[in-house]
Design a protein with these regions (language model features):
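Bacterial N-terminal signal peptides that target proteins for export
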Residues: 1-8
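Bacterial N-terminal signal peptides
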Residues: 8-16
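Eukaryotic scaffold repeat domains enriched in small/polar residues
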Residues: 21-402
Length: 402
């Protein structure tokens, strides 16, 4: 009887430990050695270049492509922010089909569209950065619904039941909430994730990238911190991934919090110093000087149907010549670009793609050429959006080395 009692206590204790562990996110660390062992295991074959500043066909020219999506009928939607429209193409032939939207603030108009996402029924949600609204279009371009929002929508994901997962950068900074889940009537159902924990360490207004998988899990990555997080559809942090770099970066500590349900990011606060000098007239001029080492993270992320995680990261630091090869200046109707060297900006090789298993371990790597502002994965196709610098979308065929 005594042995049965001891056995029962042991089982109960194990169950308690298991339940506690179930609430804790898994932190997976990938070293530089792990990454180097996977070099070249992702094969990328360039299939087509969409757009580019040398494109002469007005229907195929983009001012600032921001993101793409492919529907079940093989139509490719390319969101062109500063042309204030969505251009639609046949993905196989490359032929132009139609344009959704034009500059304006009325129904079926668009004002600086930043992000798009397709519903299960084939409609298109568009987040208007300058319009402070999200708008639902039919595939033919008819406006079906408009929802006003308080902040600029910078990323939209559609769940399996057609709810919307939306990232508002200003809202995230002000509230600490990462993603808002809306129903189709524009009501906030819940929030998912935290922007960062300011009580532990203040992080400046850094940008993030997002993706959503076919189970409605949401992934986020910081552009200047080597951390990718995966949340369940109800907001539980399931996985956190870190990765090393082949050059010295700013020291950052990434650790689970006390409960294990979130990740704390700890780094030095004194990243800049103020230098005051006087000009010839004796007027004091203040200049901010950055003292820290480079800050790097995953600029862009994407998810395939097997829930493998793709992240665009920096492989090496740019040279001084590369840093000044191209410049961009914002304007109301687009970006003005100046290029000192076309070959550098079109073929720069400082970026690579890392692929992680659903469990968070790195499994493949590939070098890419050019810049990448966002990515989209459909089957064995990888679309890299190089919009800010080269005004184009690169379409690759993917395969993995066994």
């Amino acid at each position: 009887m005594k042995q049965k009692g001891i056995l029962l206590i042991a089982i109960l204790f194990t169950l308690i430990i298991s339940l506690a562990a179930a609430d804790r996110a898994v932190l997976v660390k990938n070293s530089l050695t792990d990454i180097n062992a996977c070099q070249g295991k992702l094969k990328l074959k360039l299939i087509r270049v969409w757009g580019g500043d040398k494109e002469v066909d007005e229907n195929k020219f983009f001012k600032t492509p921001r993101c793409v999506s492919l529907d079940k009928n093989g139509l490719l939607y390319i969101c062109d922010m500063h042309s204030h429209c969505i251009k639609v193409f046949e993905s196989i032939s490359g032929n132009y089909v139609r344009t959704l939207g034009q500059f304006g603030k009325g129904p079926a108009d668009l004002y600086a569209p930043e992000t798009i996402a397709l519903t299960t029924g084939g409609d298109i949600w568009v987040g208007e950065n300058a319009g402070f609204r999200i708008q639902l279009f039919s595939p033919e371009g008819k406006s079906k619904k408009i929802t006003k929002v308080k902040d600029m929508p910078e990323w939209i994901g559609v769940t399996s039941n057609n709810n919307l997962a939306i990232y508002f950068h200003d809202r995230a900074i002000n509230t600490g909430k990462l993603i808002a889940i809306f129903n189709t009537d524009g009501k906030v159902l819940r929030d998912i994730g935290i922007y960062h924990d300011k009580s532990k360490n203040y992080i400046e207004s850094i940008r993030l990238a997002f993706a959503i998988d076919n189970s409605d899990s949401i992934y986020s990555s910081y552009t200047s911190i080597p951390l990718i997080r995966k949340y369940s559809s109800d907001g539980v942090l399931l996985l956190a991934i870190t990765f090393g770099y082949p050059f010295e970066t700013e020291p950052v500590e990434i650790i689970p919090n006390e409960k294990g349900d979130e990740i704390n990011i700890i780094r030095e606060n004194n990243q800049e110093s103020s230098v005051v000098q006087k000009n010839k007239r004796g007027i004091a001029l203040q200049q901010m000087v950055r003292k820290s080492k480079p800050r790097v993270g995953a600029h862009v992320i994407g998810i395939d149907t097997q829930k493998r995680i793709y992240a665009v990261t920096v492989k090496r630091l740019p040279s001084e010549k590369e840093r000044f090869a191209g410049a961009i200046y914002g304007g109301p109707n687009g970006l003005n670009r100046s290029r000192v060297n076309y070959d550098i900006v079109e073929n720069i090789d400082i970026y690579r793609v890392l692929v992680f298993s659903p469990e968070g371990k790195v499994i493949a790597e590939a070098q890419i050429r050019g810049y990448c502002d966002s990515m989209y994965i459909n089957g064995n196709r990888l679309f890299m959006v190089d919009g800010n610098i080269n005004q184009r979308v690169l379409e690759y065929e993917m395969s993995f080395e066994q």
